[in-house]
Amino acid sequence: MDALYSHFSQVLEQQRKANTRLVVAFSGGVDSRVLLELAHRYAQEHLLPCCAVHVHHGLSHNADQWVQSCAAWCQEKNIPLTVERVQLDLTQGNSIEEEARNARYQALRAHINADDLLLTGQHADDQVETFLLALKRGSGPKGLSSMAQQMPFSQGRLIRPLLDVRRQEIERCAHAIGLNWVEDESNQDTRYDRNFLRQQILPALSERWPSFAASVQRSATLCAEQEALLDELLLPVFEQLFGEDQSLAITLLSQQSELARFKLFRMWLAKLGHPMPTRHQLSLIWQQVALSQADANPILQLSQGQVRRFNQRLYLVADNQDLSAWHAPITLNTPLALPDGLGTIELTLSRGFGQIALPEQSEALWISFNPEGLSAHPAERGHSRKLKKLFQEYQVPSWLRRRTPILMYHQQVVAVAGLFVDRQFIGQDCELFWRK
């Protein structure tokens, strides 16, 4: 245990700060049981606060018992434990393993403050499994980099102190100090890819080549270094391409080689938190969206959004609700909550300082998102035009035209939030505020 603690300490020494708090991701399995012991010892020696978080996925009939066991073990060490209960969304087409992992990290994210270190128990055998799964998917250097030993996470950092340690060494230490731990029965189910590798493939590889895990770790490190070098070399180019509105400049992209474009697309999507698309999808971003006809409105659907084009720039647009049928009355000086995360809108009385004249029947004012068939006459325009044309003139991207609030009086357009007031309603009685 002393040798393992020495290794653990060396990893944490590189990341520890004066205000550091250790947060242990505590499943109760053997890896996290040993990790909790190491973190507790380190926290005591360095006078650091230490706590644990257990994520209850609700997938096993033993899950409640695991919570009780984890609570007892933490109580023995006087370590505060928080239990997070999550529900998995299995409608997105992802595997149970992937959904559980996503939910777990999302739950953990809420517990990490500035300078905190989230400690997780992945080890060298987990790294081999991750590498082989990436290889099976045909991943490039980024995927084959597998798991990083340390990385930014929420407001702090995620640390995997045991990533260089074999599973058998962790189990040997657990037995040596008399630890008990929980056993997840699903770990024996070889229908799951990771369990198949763990039970049937890795033992054969390790028996044939005892240094196989170390070799995989070395390859993963080399892949990570190559990926980091590419990021470093292309970062100045990316910063030129990337706009304040998180879009990419097509004209500058056209000056890059195809390989550089693919990498820049990956950097863009990674920055926006989108899962990596396939190589074919990267090609389609360029061929079907960026290079489509000038008068086209191209759309490429990805797993968590759409790639769109506007004014020679590429945008990643979230999948949104259709708000065409939504409408609601608006009352003076009362914020109106808008649907689908669009904030609030308020028509505020401001006699002598506003931009809108209050009509006689203010109770007939309402908000819509549907510009279909509507016309308006902005004060600065010479004549009335369809809202479709006005949106084009005001440089509103096509996907925002049915997400921009329209203030209506009976069937007349009074104003479009953030754009203009119709000349029939120019006045100083009130102001329209859209708080996104």
Curated annotation (Swiss-Prot):
Its EC number is 6.3.4.19. It comes from the Bacteria. It catalyses: cytidine(34) in tRNA(Ile2) + L-lysine + ATP = lysidine(34) in tRNA(Ile2) + AMP + diphosphate + H(+). InterPro entries: Lysidine-tRNA-synth_C, Rossmann-like_a/b/a_fold, TilS/TtcA_N, tRNA_Ile_lys_synt, tRNA_Ile_lys_synt_N, tRNA_Ile_lys_synt_subst-bd. The keyword Cytoplasm applies. One of its GO terms (molecular function) is tRNA(Ile)-lysidine synthase activity. It is an enzyme of class 6 (ligase). ATP binds at residues 27-32. The N-terminal region contains the highly conserved SGGXDS motif, predicted to be a P-loop motif involved in ATP binding. This is tRNA(Ile)-lysidine synthase. One of its GO terms (cellular component) is cytoplasm. Its main location: cytoplasm. Keywords: ATP-binding, Cytoplasm, Ligase, Nucleotide-binding, tRNA processing. It is found in: Cytoplasm.
